[in-house]
Amino acid sequence: MTTYVWSYLLEYERERADILDAVQKVFASGSLILGQSVENFETEYARYHGIAHCVGVDNGTNAVKLALESVGVGRDDEVVTVSNTAAPTVLAIDEIGARPVFVDVRDEDYLMDTDLVEAAVTPRTKAIVPVHLYGQCVDMTALRELADRRGLKLVEDCAQAHGARRDGRLAGTMSDAAAFSFYPTKVLGAYGDGGAVVTNDDETARALRRLRYYGMEEVYYVTRTPGHNSRLDEVQAEILRRKLTRLDAYVAGRRAVAQRYVDGLADLQDSHGLELPVVTDGNEHVFYVYVVRHPRRDEIIKRLRDGYDISLNISYPWPVHTMTGFAHLGVASGSLPVTERLAGEIFSLPMYPSLPHDLQDRVIEAVREVITGL
């Protein structure tokens, strides 16, 4: 049987009764769109973060898009972000007519290099979008100081960082607005698509509610454009309510899996060139994915697949600026050297809180055999 980096089935077996009860509760309520479950989830997710507002939306991509629009980013504005991210981060910027401006990432933790951001700011820059990648947070203290000094908006992409902290503060609480994805693989994942934006600003929250509902503030009357059909549905909201009560347990489970990898693979770092994740000072990592690094990555992945039936992911094999869909940005190859080097060396080991010990041990043993045999 093939081993994959993620599976929801073991988690579902444990939570089946609660998940099915959530679905039945919604179906029996008589309300499928923007009903009590969405309202309750928004209240509870905001409370978890100690923040004033949460607005549920239909997916993480639109969460980033609506977050940007809600703080006033629009056509021809520039937004500083990274290319070492999932493409939807950049798609969200591009779709509203703004221009992504890329800075490189740090070699040690693969996060936005905040020392490079100010040099990327121009008179057209309106916002910065740091991506809390793989489960740990960018240095938001540095970005907040810069944003305030230069009059810029700060929008966190928290799709991979539910429950993560930096200097004691939760991801999503360190900006003007913060976008979350509840795609099924996430640390807090739905059984389908979902997203949310959190903010402490009343007017931003009002704009978000209008933006997700066609630009309407009352039924059938468009108050202001743009407007979208971007609502979190009741079924996913009710499932997320149930799973939110277990978020800290999910995080603890992921950290335990990460520690087991450290115990089983750490000695290969000095002897055989395998690099394990570095947890930056001040970060409380939630290990959305467990990204390792080796200069012979492609050979390792092939041997694991062909010889051990272990199928691994690469997050991400193509920097966004090198994709043909973003050729119009005109970003030259070689302009982001760390990002481009990482794309040829990083890969992900299986990571989910219900990962069985015997399966993880099989992966560890296989990785050891392959790498020591290179």
Curated annotation (Swiss-Prot):
Keywords: Antibiotic biosynthesis, Pyridoxal phosphate, Transferase
Family: Belongs to the degT/dnrJ/eryC1 family.
E.C. number(s) listed in UniProt: 2.6.1.106
Family matches, as SUPFAM superfamilies: PLP-dependent transferases (SSF53383)
Enzyme class per UniProt: transferase
Pfam short name (any one): DegT_DnrJ_EryC1
Pathway membership, UniProt: Antibiotic biosynthesis
InterPro entries tied to this protein: DegT/StrS_aminotransferase, PyrdxlP-dep_Trfase, PyrdxlP-dep_Trfase_major, PyrdxlP-dep_Trfase_small
The keyword Membrane is annotated on this UniProt entry: no
Modified residues (N6-(pyridoxal phosphate)lysine): 186
Species assigned in the record: Micromonospora megalomicea subsp. nigra
Gene3D superfamilies in the cross-refs: Aspartate Aminotransferase, domain 1, Type I PLP-dependent aspartate aminotransferase-like (Major domain)
Record protein name field: dTDP-3-amino-3,4,6-trideoxy-alpha-D-glucose transaminase
Biological role stated in the UniProt entry: Involved in the biosynthesis of the amino sugar dTDP-L-megosamine which is found in the macrolide antibiotic and antiparasitic megalomicin A.
Top-rank taxon, per record: Bacteria
